[in-house]
């Protein structure tokens, strides 16, 4: 809802008629973020809605991020479980890279900056005897409900708002 009500928004999702899996890589948002940060001299609130690690995982990262191989699962079953996990891990690795780049952009300015990241769901990757896969099942598993999140604060943020960030950092 925040995204739809923003004064200015940039949507890099597929155009109407394209498949949802045709989303562009999350890294395509980085030049837009760099431009927004560079062109403002006032307060700025940015929401980056990343597509992240969704099936087909191999389409969620550039080929040069294929660190865990083989990652070419053409089907999802017990026999391809390791390939599926490799592709998923590569997508996580790419997300880590994108978040590192976002932090670099925020850290490169003298502004008071912060980042909050939170996944919207976890994922089943045939992690137990039930061999469940994906998310959004009627009875969610631990793997679907466990989501990663973190907060990052610039040095300037911590200097100016030390008590608040210390309290937040100590509450995890």
Predicted regions and their residues:
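Catalytic domains that recognize anionic headgroups
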Residues: 1-170
């Amino acid at each position: 809802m925040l995204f739809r009500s923003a004064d200015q928004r940039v949507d890099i999702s597929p155009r109407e008629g394209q498949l949802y899996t045709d989303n562009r890589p999350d890294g395509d948002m980085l030049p837009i973020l760099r431009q927004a940060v560079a062109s403002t001299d006032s307060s700025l609130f940015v929401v980056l809605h990343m597509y992240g690690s969704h099936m087909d995982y191999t389409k969620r990262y550039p080929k040069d991020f294929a660190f865990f191989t083989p990652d070419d699962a053409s089907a999802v079953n017990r026999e391809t479980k390791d390939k599926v996990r490799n592709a998923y891990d590569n997508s996580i690795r790419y997300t880590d890279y994108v978040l590192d780049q976002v932090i670099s952009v925020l850290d490169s300015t003298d502004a008071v900056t912060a980042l909050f990241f939170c996944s919207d769901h976890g994922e089943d990757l045939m992690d137990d005897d039930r061999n469940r896969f994906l998310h959004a099942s009627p009875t969610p598993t631990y793997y679907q409900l466990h989501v990663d999140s973190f907060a990052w604060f610039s040095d300037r943020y911590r200097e100016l708002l030390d008590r608040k960030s210390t309290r937040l950092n100590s509450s995890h």
